[in-house]
Amino acid sequence: VYGLKPSYGIVPLEGHYFPGTDGADIPLSVTGPLARTAEDLALAINLTSDIALQGAPSRSLKDYRLLVITETDLAIVDDEIAQAVESIAAQCENAGATVSRSSDLLPELAGLHSQYLHMLLTVLAVRDPTSDYPLPDLPGWCDMLDQQARARRQYRALFEQFDAILCPNAGTTAFPHTPVPMNDRKLVVNGEEQEFGKQFGWVSIATYPGLPAVSAPIGADSEGLPIGLQIITDFHADHTAVELGRLIGALGNG
């Protein structure tokens, strides 16, 4: 199954608003399609987007410049997932793509993640009468929006040198459902227990600056659970992410 988290604001959120609201877009929130193929993702985003998106720049892997991230200080990644992403990177490189594993243009992810969490918790607290999270005043909220805009501009500079970021969707494959509250949940990754919330480190890379991200299947772990690749592109370059998902899917790993 393929999925697209579209660029922020391009797909209407009607039917997805918080109860009691009258239609204001929800910061950080998007809605996007799921599909069996990347081709169907492309069709779905064209049908649902409020703007006319540009097509992908190329239909050949040899024309793409890729930045690969398989580890950060924010979240531990299962070795099988990291190996699967590295295998895809190697196959892309063999197909002629330019592959890098570091760049001075990559924003400082830990700092942006902290800003993301502050914005996320603020948005959640606004409509939660039981929340004790401290809400910002108006100048404070404007500062948060300025920080987010700066993050998007930082990524815009990165995407002048790269067409996409390849990284894990999450640090683990699917785990058992549990009624344990999110703040108390734990995950075991490579034998090491960590807080569930730290996995949001992979979510925030695309979500905080409002960038599009495709989730593409790239195989399975030793227990047969699917491994997903996250393909992140520049703002409004949704079709580039989708096309890369198609090209990577054609390598035969999904």
Predicted segments, located by residue:
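Amidase signature
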Residues: 43-198, 208, 236, 247-253
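Structural helix-boundary/capping segments
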Residues: 1-72, 86-95, 207-254
